[in-house]
């Protein structure tokens, strides 16, 4: 009996809906045999690998022509999954792609689970776990810089760094083991405390340096979470729309019309800015609006950046002062909106430099982008073209654990503990790093990771 892991799977690999092309993908030992049953054209078993072949998809039971197609035939092992792959290129459309998928399933294929094609690439050694995760990052990338990080990870930059470090740790462990078991060998360098500590300090410094890229990598991957706050009707939603250059939030003259948290992305110098337009924070008896206010407070706590919008044409209110207070420990930019009207706000009572804007007149909006650029990019040296970045929360957590384990080794060596007693912590470091690439990852976690992928990938 063919196991579920190695039967033939099929799925639609293009987004459902109308389009020029739709693709139904098959992977597995029986891909060619199944496709041949429903394809009228060249014998797919005899065509050269990695070729496109013209023909028609036919229902073998009725003889009905389903569509005019081009079939890509790719023979293992030089494929994404390292299995035989068939890609049926149809005319785009929900009905035709679904019909062809159902034909493939009827003739012996199984509907693929989310991410199962990439999972097979991992199980068959085509990619490691970091590269598989990079595939999803490429799909989800919102800017060119985020995509570049994912492409470097797919190319193996992070894998190489982790694998090389694991190998060096393994060499150190082997050296310690030989010294313990065969002390009479003179041709092996003695694993003294000084020798081992020099190496483990190098490992710790390398991984700590990698951890320093985590904040920048997370920003490039996920964006700068930016909360737009202010009392009701100061122009928060209008500012959001202006930055997005389209109407996504409800903009009216009635206070309290944003009753929930609205999230949108805008591209700032190749980095995604996740704009969160919060409900105005104020006391209210409206239950729905109260929920929005609570979510706004939560968004404020979690934001990387806060844009506090004040009304320049009115004196500071108690609500304004409350917002100034609760946002004072955040990375904040204060915006004075409605500067096209006479200014009455007391700027002397504001704690920092402000940016005067008029969303209505589209004045000084570019200065907001300049300030964000200075805060996060130029001053922080955000992007280095050839650097390897940590951007995945799973990777960051595991590297932190590996550093902690190495710190335990180094502290033990400092206290004069015998090297052999510290083997456990050093071995644990080696195992933790293996979880990043998938060499030592529980099956349940692997299943969970790939379940986040879309069907057909």
UniProtKB/Swiss-Prot annotation:
Residues annotated as binding (6S)-5-formyl-5,6,7,8-tetrahydrofolate: 25, 87, 126, 457
Co-factor binding details: Binds 1 potassium ion per subunit.
Residues reported to bind GTP: 233-238, 252-258, 277-280
Gene3D superfamilies: P-loop containing nucleotide triphosphate hydrolases (3.40.50.300), Probable tRNA modification gtpase trme, domain 1 (3.30.1360.120), tRNA modification GTPase MnmE domain 2 (1.20.120.430)
Pfam families: MMR_HSR1, MnmE_helical, TrmE_N
UniProt: K(+) binding residues: 233, 252, 254, 257
Coiled coil: none
Cofactor: K(+)
Enzymatic class: hydrolase
Gene Ontology annotations for the cellular component aspect, listed alphabetically: cytoplasm; cytosol
GO molecular function: GTP binding; GTPase activity; metal ion binding
Subcellular location: Cytoplasm
List of residues binding Mg(2+): 237, 258
One BP annotation, GO: tRNA wobble uridine modification
HAMAP family: GTPase_MnmE
Function: Exhibits a very high intrinsic GTPase hydrolysis rate. Involved in the addition of a carboxymethylaminomethyl (cmnm) group at the wobble position (U34) of certain tRNAs, forming tRNA-cmnm(5)s(2)U34.
Protein name (database record): tRNA modification GTPase MnmE
Protein's organism: Streptococcus pneumoniae (strain ATCC BAA-255 / R6)
């Amino acid at each position: 009996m063919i196991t579920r892991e190695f039967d033939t799977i099929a799925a639609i690999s293009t987004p459902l809906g109308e389009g020029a092309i739709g693709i139904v993908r098959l992977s597995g030992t029986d891909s060619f045999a199944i496709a041949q049953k429903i394809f009228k054209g060249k014998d797919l078993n005899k065509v050269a690998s990695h070729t496109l072949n013209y023909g028609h998809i036919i229902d073998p039971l009725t003889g009905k022509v389903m569509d005019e197609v081009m079939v890509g035939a790719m023979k293992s092992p030089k494929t994404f999954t390292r299995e035989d792959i068939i890609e049926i290129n149809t005319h785009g459309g929900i009905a035709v792609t679904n019909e062809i998928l159902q034909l493939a399933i009827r003739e012996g294929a199984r509907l693929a689970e989310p991410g199962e094609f990439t999972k097979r690439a991992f199980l068959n050694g085509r990619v490691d776990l970091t590269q598989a995760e990079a595939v999803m990052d490429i799909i989800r990338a919102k800017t060119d810089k985020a995509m570049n990080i994912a492409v470097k990870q797919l190319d193996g930059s992070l894998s190489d760094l982790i694998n090389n470090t694991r190998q060096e740790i393994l060499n150190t462990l082997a050296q310690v083991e030989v010294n313990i078991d065969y002390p009479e060998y003179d041709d092996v360098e003695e694993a003294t405390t000084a020798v081992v500590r020099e190496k483990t300090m190098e490992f710790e410094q390398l991984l700590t340096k990698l951890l320093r890229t985590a904040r920048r990598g997370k920003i490039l991957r996920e964006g700068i979470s930016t909360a737009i706050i202010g009392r009701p009707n100061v122009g928060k939603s209008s500012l959001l729309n202006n930055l997005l250059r389209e109407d996504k939030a409800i903009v009216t003259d009635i206070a309290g019309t944003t009753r929930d948290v609205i999230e949108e992305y805008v591209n700032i110098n190749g980095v995604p800015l996740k704009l969160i337009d919060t409900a105005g924070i104020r006391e209210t008896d409206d239950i729905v609006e109260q929920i929005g206010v609570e979510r706004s407070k939560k968004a404020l706590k979690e934001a990387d950046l806060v844009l506090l919008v004040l009304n320049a044409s009115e004196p500071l209110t108690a609500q304004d002062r409350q917002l100034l207070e609760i946002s004072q420990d955040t990375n904040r930019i204060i915006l004075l909106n409605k500067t096209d009207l006479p200014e009455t706000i007391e700027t002397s009572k504001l704690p920092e430099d402000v940016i005067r804007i008029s969303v209505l007149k589209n004045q000084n909006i570019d200065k907001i982008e300049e300030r964000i650029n200075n805060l996060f990019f130029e001053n922080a040296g955000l992007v280095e073209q050839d650097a390897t970045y940590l951007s995945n929360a799973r990777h960051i957590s595991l590297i932190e654990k590996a550093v902690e384990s190495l710190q335990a080794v180094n502290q033990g060596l400092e206290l004069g503990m015998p090297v052999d007693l510290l083997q456990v912590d050093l071995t644990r470091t080696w195992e933790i790093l293996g979880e990043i690439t998938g060499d030592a990852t529980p099956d349940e976690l692997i299943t969970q990771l790939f379940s986040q992928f879309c069907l057909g990938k």
